[in-house]
Amino acid sequence: MKRDLQGHYVTISTVGEAAQAFVPEPLPPNPSLDWMPDLRSKFDQALLALGRLDSISTFLPDISLFLYMYVRKEAVLSSMIEGTQSSLSDLLLFELDMEPGVPLDDVREVSNYVAALDYGLKRLAEGFPLSLRLIKEMHGVLLYKGRGSNQTPGEFRRTQNWIGGTRPGNAAFVPPPAARVLECMGKLELFLHDQPQPTPALLKAALAHVQFETIHPFLDGNGRLGRLLITLLLCEQKMLREPMLYLSLYFKSHRQYYYELLNGVRLSGNWEAWLDFFAEAVIVTATQAVDTARQLIDLANEDRDRISDLGRAAASTLRVHRALLERPITASGWLVKKTGITPATVNKCLRHLERLGVLRELTSRRRNRVFSYTGILEIMNRGTELPG
């Protein structure tokens, strides 16, 4: 399929020099997509993988336990793409009001990502549409406090931004002028609402992600919010009952190719190459998520079996174990509140779990000690390793 530039350039003057800013054509692509057999087959496979992922809730004993960790893993990965150095353990320690091992602003960025997703899903559940208003509200949550809090959170940019380089004149890409942002985002909102015509949900998510990245409507947080919108849109369109598809690890692993594909769409209209990549990302990510869920179930069952052999101590230790599935890094004080067991008994249970190799203490103090469920963290940490 031969297409030309998917938009047009306008000359802008900013930071004392002229530059060419790109204004994209509205969606859907024109001419229409070329659904070659290979691409159609890849998208069909992606839809099947998405269906298997959505069925996780039928075999997970408690989907909320899986989501708690999975959402936080995504927050770490999505923020890592933007340069933060927070690990999953750092985030969980931060949520316990403990000192993480990296700069506080890094962990706060990751924590804000979790909060922004939670906020968006809550608004959708209340019947609020996926709209420019909701996108801006989520952006306000994403940039609350920490780095980026001075970058007009919750508001479309009023000044020019650019991607790569030190100024627009040597940038890799210059998004639309600030005066055109509302117009471009308004057209994207129409597309999200199936105007001028309906678009299947997975295809809509793939196309909208590129368009959002191209418009780059905010001064900061565009990448994180653009990845968040994929999951949010699939939930709104009822493709997923729970927010379980996160593509950041795949995008991170193929980062250079990802950026090349975005530019390929803008410069030559090669939407098909992007869609092939996006479908592969969905297949790989959804399959990995199902495998991760099964590993977590197997781990919990194996540990329960070992705890059951403790004899009289088994009943209370199983209650503590159940609570630890919910919070794999937690303090003994929280376990007392969660289980309703006395502090002395909780501490005995923790000693049993340490002896079994289920837990590892992260502190060396007498009160409100902090423990890590090592097996869960080993499973969830795969792919989140910080660069050495």
Regions found by a protein language model. Give the residues of each.
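FIC/Doc superfamily catalytic core
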Residues: M1-G388
